[in-house]
Amino acid sequence: MSIGLSNIYSSDVVKHAKKVIVEINDKMPYTYGNNIINVKDVDYIVPVSYPLPQDVPPAPNEKDRMIAGHIAEYLKDGDCVQIGIGGIPNSVTEFLAEKKDLGIHTELLGDGLAKLAMRGVVNGSKKQFMKGKIVTSIVMGTDVVYDFVNKNPDVYVMSCSKCNDPYTVRKNKNQVSINTTLEVDLTGQACSEAIG
């Protein structure tokens, strides 16, 4: 069985858990990756049926669009992108429609990147690691991305511990990361998790 939309720690935890209780939602997309659990490893199954949360990205403001347009100029055909959460990163995807052969290796796959893949802008043909695959740990957005990933063999949901491991990320040449951050210190380190 597939873990579904998020493999932040789930596949790692299941290997070490004394009891495994899973909730099976008939509305959950089936995804491929290292997020597959053998039913023999499950102690309890709880069947449910409820709609998935719809995380509609905020409409970008003029400043977001201006910054996003500037950022998009730096991306080249064949780059492998990681795009984080937030208004500016979401806006960047709107400026990438004319690019070619983009790859995706990202922690979070949302509507914007899914739309690029559906348009053929993303094909992963220039990636060195998992060529042709869209690699992610979390799928979050609306039914646009949920429908896109459902039973899509081109999408690989990887455990966060591997997806975000610098050793894994560096396997793709021309990996470009676009993120919003909360703090930057004097040495250039950026913190996107918390302030303080």
Where do the language-model regions lie?
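Conserved phosphate- and dinucleotide-binding cores of soluble alpha/beta proteins
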Residues: 1-196
